[in-house]
């Protein structure tokens, strides 16, 4: 079973309410992150990632109900992304390079984030977050991709201007078949 699904079992029941200030602070962090991605300010976005980041997007398969727990590939199995900081830095270099053909000319993206639910993490100063997302991407003249799904993040408080860093991101897309030509952008 997918580790982050087990980790996010905290969201099988309604989480305890958090202070409105914390809810607002985390939502503003996500809106800022989306703005950085939409504006292709990737170096600034990369600074939001923790040095020990795990960025994971499992493969989703359609399963019958009794096998629903096998719907997503797990850590260590095949995945669209299973990246640490070094892999993320390599992806960042590729999308900002003049020779990175998959993003030259650049995609136009819009990241929408909502339904932010927050629970205390296992460590003081960490929070488990579930959020819904839509990523709209237009590339070249007619290429259009829309992705919807859930992000399960672990955020850690830090002393930066944004107040948080992303320690773990698991992207659970609603599609089981990806029709896009590539996944050369960030969720």
From Swiss-Prot:
GO biological process: 3-phenylpropionate catabolic process
Keywords of this entry: Aromatic hydrocarbons catabolism, Dioxygenase, NAD, Oxidoreductase
Pfam families membership: Ring_hydroxyl_B
InterPro entries referenced in this protein's UniProt entry, alphabetically: NTF2-like_dom_sf, Rng_hydr_dOase-bsu
UniProt-listed Enzyme Commission number(s): 1.14.12.26
NCBIfam families: PRK10069.1 (NF007479)
Protein name: Chlorobenzene dioxygenase subunit beta
Species this chain originates from: Cupriavidus sp. (strain PS12)
């Amino acid at each position: 079973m997918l580790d982050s699904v087990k980790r996010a079992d905290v969201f099988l029941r309604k989480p305890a309410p958090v202070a409105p200030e914390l809810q607002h602070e985390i939502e503003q962090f996500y809106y800022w992150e989306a703005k950085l991605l939409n504006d292709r300010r990737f170096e600034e976005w990369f600074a939001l990632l923790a040095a020990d980041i795990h960025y994971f997007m499992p493969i989703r398969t359609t399963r019958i109900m009794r096998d629903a727990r096998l719907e997503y590939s797990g850590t260590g199995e095949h995945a669209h992304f299973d990246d640490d900081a070094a892999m993320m830095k390599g992806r960042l270099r590729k999308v900002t390079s003049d020779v990175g053909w998959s993003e030259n000319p650049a995609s136009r993206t819009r990241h929408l984030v909502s339904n932010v639910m927050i629970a205390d993490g296992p460590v003081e100063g960490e929070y488990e977050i579930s959020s819904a997302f839509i990523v709209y991407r237009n590339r070249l003249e007619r290429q259009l991709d829309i992705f919807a799904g859930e992000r399960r993040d672990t955020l850690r408080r830090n002393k930066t201007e944004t107040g948080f860093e992303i320690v773990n991101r698991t992207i659970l897309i609603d599609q089981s078949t990806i029709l896009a030509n590539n996944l050369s952008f960030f969720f």
